[in-house]
Amino acid sequence: MASKKGVRLIITLECTECRTNTNKRSPGVNRYTTSKNRRNTTGRIELKKFCPHCNTHTVHKEIK
């Protein structure tokens, strides 16, 4: 029997500064993966996390 999908989803958080910032420490776009509860958080997540490419704490938005 196939099991039902759980409430938790795996999402990807992407740095918003990496797309526009040209003065970066290294090229590329930083992404984090995390999970969220589908029932408690229905909207898109925005978290402030460290970006090694920008070398600062920046806002990371949910993309998937």
UniProtKB/Swiss-Prot annotation:
It comes from the Bacteria. InterPro entries: Ribosomal_bL33 (IPR001705), Ribosomal_bL33_CS (IPR018264), Ribosomal_bL33_sf (IPR038584), Ribosomal_zn-bd (IPR011332). Keywords: Ribonucleoprotein, Ribosomal protein. One of its GO terms (biological process) is translation. PROSITE patterns: RIBOSOMAL_L33. One of its GO terms (molecular function) is structural constituent of ribosome. One of its GO terms (cellular component) is cytoplasm. PANTHER family: 50S RIBOSOMAL PROTEIN L33, CHLOROPLASTIC, LARGE RIBOSOMAL SUBUNIT PROTEIN BL33C. HAMAP family: Ribosomal_bL33 (MF_00294). Belongs to the bacterial ribosomal protein bL33 family. This is Large ribosomal subunit protein bL33. It comes from Crocosphaera subtropica (strain ATCC 51142 / BH68).
